[in-house]
């Protein structure tokens, strides 16, 4: 288990930009819920007949990561919404982002951006290049899948998508 806390001010600008672009482009302007993103996810899921898109914001992901489990149910989504609303009411965006970045798993037992940066690149997270930040960010939706498939075409494609945003 590797975990190292990184204060918001010391987080790489490249990583901040990559994560916002990839996970929640409207993060700074919403109150915890991206209604347009949720509508798009519902539409994509309905059209495909499967759950392919989540529509969760960084705030919602943080609520789930800190307080809930991975189950996919309406009850869990309701709990996530309530926790997200409470967090957004009492916590500023920088702190939410800091908590999120320090709580997500990037690889088996590797938690937080600092630990991930040192694990994958042997450098502090503050020194991540744009390419390195994009590749780390590409892992966020499925870190354990990419742990088992580090050279997958999916990871390369996702990295390129993050770089273009």
UniProtKB/Swiss-Prot annotation:
Catalytically driven reaction(s)? [GlcNAc-(1->4)-Mur2Ac(oyl-L-Ala-gamma-D-Glu-L-Lys-D-Ala-D-Ala)](n)-di-trans,octa-cis-undecaprenyl diphosphate + beta-D-GlcNAc-(1->4)-Mur2Ac(oyl-L-Ala-gamma-D-Glu-L-Lys-D-Ala-D-Ala)-di-trans,octa-cis-undecaprenyl diphosphate = [GlcNAc-(1->4)-Mur2Ac(oyl-L-Ala-gamma-D-Glu-L-Lys-D-Ala-D-Ala)](n+1)-di-trans,octa-cis-undecaprenyl diphosphate + di-trans,octa-cis-undecaprenyl diphosphate + H(+)
Q: Which GO terms describe its biological process?
A: cell wall organization; peptidoglycan biosynthetic process; regulation of cell shape
- Stated EC number for the protein is 2.4.99.28
A Gene Ontology term for the protein's cellular component: plasma membrane
Quick one: where is this thing mainly located?
membrane
Give the record's pathway: Cell wall biogenesis; peptidoglycan biosynthesis
**InterPro entries from the entry?**
Glyco_trans_51 (IPR001264), Lysozyme-like_dom_sf (IPR023346), PBP_transglycosylase (IPR036950), Pep_trsgly (IPR011812)
Among Pfam families, the record links this protein to: Transgly
Q: Got any disulfides in this one, which pairs?
A: none
Name of the featured protein: Biosynthetic peptidoglycan transglycosylase
């Amino acid at each position: 288990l590797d975990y190292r806390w990184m204060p918001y001010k010391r987080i790489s600008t490249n990583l901040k930009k990559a994560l916002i672009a990839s996970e929640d482009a409207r993060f700074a302007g919403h109150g915890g819920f991206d209604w347009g993103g949720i509508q798009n996810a519902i539409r994509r899921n309905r059209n495909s007949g499967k759950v392919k898109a989540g529509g969760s914001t960084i705030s919602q992901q943080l609520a789930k990561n800190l307080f809930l489990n991975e189950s996919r149910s309406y009850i869990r989504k309701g709990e996530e919404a309530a926790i997200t609303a409470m967090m957004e009411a009492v916590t500023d965006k920088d702190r939410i982002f800091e908590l999120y970045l320090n709580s997500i798993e990037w690889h088996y037992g590797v938690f937080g951006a600092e630990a991930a940066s040192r694990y994958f690149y042997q450098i502090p997270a503050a020194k991540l290049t744009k390419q390195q930040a994009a590749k780390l960010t590409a892992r966020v939706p499925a870190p354990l899948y990419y742990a088992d498939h580090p050279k997958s075409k999916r990871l390369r494609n996702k990295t390129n998508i993050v770089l273009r945003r």
